[in-house]
Amino acid sequence: MSIDTYTETLKINKLIEKATSHFQLSSTQLYKKILKNHEGELTELGAINVKTGKYTGRSPKDKFIVTEPSYKDNINWGDINQPMDEETFLKLYNKVLDYLNQKEELYIFSGYAGSDKESRLKLKVINELAWHNLFARNMFIRPESIDEAQNIKPNFTIVSAPHFKANPKLDGTHSETFVIISFKHKVILIGGTEYAGEMKKGIFSVMNYLLPIQDIMSMHCSANVGEKGDVALFFGLSGTGKTTLSADPKRKLIGDDEHGWNKNGVFNIEGGCYAKAIHLSKQKEPQIYNAIKYGTILENTVTNDDGTVDFDDNTYTENTRAAYPIDYIENIVTPSKAAHPNTIIFLTADAFGVIPPISKLTKDQAMYHFLSGFTSKLAGTERGVTEPQPSFSTCFGAPFLPLSPTKYADLLGNLIDIHDVDVYLVNTGWTGGKYGVGRRISLHYTREMVDQAISGKLKNTKYIKDDTFGLNIPVQIDSVPTTILNPINAWNNKDNYKAQAYDLIQRFNNNFKKFGKEVEHIANKGAFNQ
């Protein structure tokens, strides 16, 4: 099959220039379309509540990268970065473009990924659904004017057709759903799923390719900055506390999920926040709760007849979400960038209940835990996950990393050295027993520990090296019970603790073998009990 970039561009332009295609609509204009099309409902808080159908999380098994000659040797192919040949992609791409051309209305957004203009990606988003376009408007960086938007020549285009269902036998997919990235054609093609998070994570995957090949670190983390300009990064997978812990009233938010780190410092890749909304309350998370207002999208929350939202109701999913512009948070940095980090926090939700609530890592331990990326898959963030499961996600973001893990590890290691960054491992998971026996570590105590780490109070405090993991645990932290600092003390049965801990250590060792001899020096110095 032959189709050139010129032909594709003509088809894209035809979609954009259709009389019924709506370009750069405001939030109010999109609200009107959403309500008219019955895509969502208005809540008492002013936010729009939508349902994403049967897919309430990402579909990682349906994600592909096109095997184009100029790029294929750079990609870390495997279960995460699944290959699709170019001919198969182009056939499906044209089917989707023809499908969208028949739609009565389309919604177009132009904007950016990357708040540092030196490391910015120009975007165009073509949506079948009005609420998806509002999502794009909320999550990506918005141009300051219509004129600016019209003059954006995109480096990448998202084509989103959630109601187009693929035929696996004909289209080369695994199911009706597909998320396909083509670096040659500069397209992210999405179909068969209404879960809007595929758009944001698709662009993140693209940035995780484009930035590191320029020796710019890309990171699955949140970031904030204190009054003195001290910057903290929070690494962790969905549900481990990145959004919650970085939304600190005492510090200004840089971003809640995706960042780059270049010669100028840290910058947000996005223009919005995508916060978990399950059990959200004004008391526990006031900044996030106050962002649930006009312009915000709520995904899969339950509303009562009077329009009130029941954030505790998980009828549709545990993975309820709120998508809002970053300026809905009161304490933010504008633009969303800051200096080089002083502190890095690795967040993990340990379902075994054996990792300390906080420990200070050496450089080698930091690299070991960055490559390991231990956490637990939390309910709802992926299809098929209904309770926490221990897992390893390289660099705390394996589903979004197209390149070899060592590329990201080398970049981070160099930056830690250059800028003398303190690194801590923080367990936001369980204590006193594994999941189902123990309890979740109190958010209040986690905040206290993190606050004192990023303020520098823990930099020179007294530490003990625990016998089980070889981690440096603070002897005392103000306002935190000493009984929880060393996890063995929180278990009633010490033998059970040791058995569970050694089981986890063995899992770490087995997982690290996949990296081979290339990182043997990190394992020798950074692994548990070294």
UniProtKB/Swiss-Prot annotation:
Binding site for Mn(2+): 201, 220, 257
Binding residues annotated for ATP, in chain numbering: 201, 220, 236-244, 285, 321, 440-441, 446
Pfam families to which the protein is assigned, alphabetical: PEPCK_ATP (PF01293)
Any GO molecular function: phosphoenolpyruvate carboxykinase (ATP) activity
CC per GO annotation: cytosol
A GO BP entry: gluconeogenesis
Coiled coil (residue ranges): none
Subcellular location: Cytoplasm
Binding-site residues, substrate: 58, 195, 201, 321
Cross-referenced InterPro entries: PEP_carboxykinase_ATP (IPR001272), PEP_carboxykinase_C (IPR013035), PEP_carboxykinase_N (IPR008210), PEPCK_ATP_CS (IPR015994)
Keyword Manganese annotated: yes
Pathway recorded for this protein: Carbohydrate biosynthesis; gluconeogenesis
Family per record: Belongs to the phosphoenolpyruvate carboxykinase (ATP) family.
Protein name (Swiss-Prot/TrEMBL): Phosphoenolpyruvate carboxykinase (ATP)
Organism: Staphylococcus epidermidis (strain ATCC 35984 / DSM 28319 / BCRC 17069 / CCUG 31568 / BM 3577 / RP62A)
Gene designation per UniProt: pckA
